[in-house]
Curated annotation (Swiss-Prot):
Function: Catalyzes the decarboxylative condensation of pimeloyl-[acyl-carrier protein] and L-alanine to produce 8-amino-7-oxononanoate (AON), [acyl-carrier protein], and carbon dioxide.
Protein name: 8-amino-7-oxononanoate synthase
Enzyme category, top tier: transferase
Matches recorded under Gene3D superfamilies: Aspartate Aminotransferase, domain 1, Type I PLP-dependent aspartate aminotransferase-like (Major domain)
Keyword Phosphoprotein among UniProt keywords: no
InterPro entries for the chain: Aminotrans_II_pyridoxalP_BS, Aminotransferase_I/II_large, AON_synthase_class-II, AONS_Archaea/Proteobacteria, AONS_Proteobacteria, PyrdxlP-dep_Trfase, PyrdxlP-dep_Trfase_major, PyrdxlP-dep_Trfase_small
Residue list for modification N6-(pyridoxal phosphate)lysine: 236
Binding site for substrate: 21, 133, 352
GO molecular function list: 8-amino-7-oxononanoate synthase activity; pyridoxal phosphate binding
Name of the coding gene: bioF
Amino acid sequence: MIWQEKIDAALDARRVADALRRRYPVAQGAGRWLVADDCQYLNFSSNDYLGLSHHPQIIRAWQQGADQFGVGSGGSGHVSGYSVAHQVLEEELAEWLGYSRALLFISGFAANQAVIAAMMAKEDRIVADRLSHASLLEAASLSPSPLRRFAHNDVTHLARLLASPCPGQQLVVTEGVFSMDGDSAPLEEIQQVTQQHDGWLMVDDAHGTGVIGEQGRGSCWLQKVKPELLVVTFGKGFGVSGAAVLCSNTVADYLLQFARHLIYSTSMPPAQAQALRASLAVIRSDEGDARREKLAALITRFRAGVQDLPFTLAGSCSAIQPLIVGDNSRALQLAEKLRQQGCWVTAIRPPTVPAGTARLRLTLTAAHEMQDIDRLLEVLHGNG
């Protein structure tokens, strides 16, 4: 098979399965409204959970940072790209989340890949939740360490895997809030079992940080758990982009030496770090509390109104509210019908989710109003 035949065959297979992904150019894609093709939609596909992407204080911080530092960092943090803005943000994140150190990354995907690649050797073992994010599972599959996957949130299965002989170290990998189902990991039980087998715990809390817990400190804080490695991202609750790894002093020093994604990538712009500092200030403030309370009320309203629809509603109390449809083509048809009625909803299909679990992945944000939820429910009931 030549290259073009290989590519064509892969694309054809996706088309036949109604699994071909598309991008839609939007004029506005975050916040309450999405604008595409000169049409305005209620936006139920955004990760901007607290509605901070358009916060004037955060926008102003980025603008002022660009005036002060320019629009780029100018290099890797190991060369010339680590500014005082990066340093102060790392210190503020570490203090907020109760860790000795924080290291900034350009994305959550890069952070997860970097940590696993740097930490793991062939004699070690990775034990990951089966529904962990693609960045975690891909990093684990590319690692020289063997990967074992435990059934979703099944601590008993995890314990059995950890109990089997391993010549090296064991790293347990999970998420705080799972990106496709919106449910939470039983972190306290997972950490207890991990410690019983002398392992370390790595938690990706992309969808919890800023959104849940006291001052938005996330899933681990809420469950009174402190993993050895905590990954937080800034494209969700913070409304910006980027990520950080929270860890001990010695682990931070180790990653600075061996995490290639950190060493060989240009740092995020200092202006972005300034915007993230402003976002963190909002998240920790009374305004942040009010936004989280509003989001919780919107979630409650949605779940109460969707119970009698002929779809499977995932057991999620988070901003991620999936409606499991099952069939790929049915999910696509429903998403299109909702868009025709003014609600922008995304159909998620395999391989992103397991076969037979195609879904409408609805996300609610603090930028929404109660009437938006009521409109969504009205449209869903009309198409159920």
